[in-house]
Amino acid sequence: MIAPAVPNVPWQERPEGLKGAPIWRYTENPISGRNPVEGVARIFNSAVMPYNGEFIGVFRGEQTNGIPYIYLGHSKDAIHWDFEKDKIPFVDENGNSFMPYYAYDPRLVKVEDTYYIIWCQDFYGASIGMAKTKDFKTFVRLENPFIPFNRNAVLFPRKINGKFMLLSRPSDSGHTPFGDIFLSESPDMVYWGKHRHVMGRSSEWWESVKIGGGAAPIETSEGWLLFYHGVSGTCNGFVYSIGGAILDLDNPSIVKYRCETFLLTPEEWYEERGFVPNVVFPCATIHDPESGKIAIYYGCADSYVGLAFTKFDEIVDYIKTHSVVRQEDTEIGIR
């Protein structure tokens, strides 16, 4: 992994007898509870990262009026979190309040000296919203990158060939029954273009309905390690699982490896039961290149935040060993 060292990455050793993919859950999951602050019923689908020797995060808080918004959280160990009671106060470039009607499923990525928050919001339908901060005190809204409808935007943690790179999932305004991952680039985080298809839903049952970006890609010598979500349909609704892929380092619209099996699927009570049952939804990782430890943060049943662990060498080997890449995934994504 090519990233700054994080020696205090949260960690729990692999349990004996683990079967399937080399990912295991934190035994004290979930790490968020109901009614975490006044006026918020649930916190889930949230993104965290190291900050000033400790940890900071942006959290989807479902308010008691049913409207989701983004709240800031602080932690010394990235497991036990204190949430600010007020939602994040976004402003425009002139310092005037500029608040979306709702905001949910945030991601948090640092590029150079700036932290970027990306979320889904209402802009005449489901759309992508963006903001930037350098101190987690002033949050400046950026222009919406795309017209409706789009979700699951994930920013790469560094520029590639001098450009910002963003994954997204074009969709509809509801519970989208389709969806592929696309790549877009920008010179300035305002104007986006050169859209490329990255990968689509597959014939594998667990991701046969739609897929979407998850945690920010992790730079490695093998390529960009991507944890994403895949969705299947059942007689009881959608099931969300976590998948893994490795994208080309210089041209991430090209998929080098894509695991044919899920890495994590709903099994525990906090994943199977909740506001939206049967959901594991990856949003962030904290990773330490020196030890190879990766902590994965994921939403559980639209009700909780869960934590899982893996080792870099083991998960990359598993993805490569179980890889099935379609011809269109290996193309540059333009027709």
Located regions from the model:
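Beta-rich carbohydrate-recognition and catalytic domains
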Residues: 1-101, 109-154, 158-209, 218-275, ...
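C-terminal substrate/ligand-recognition segments
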Residues: 283, 287
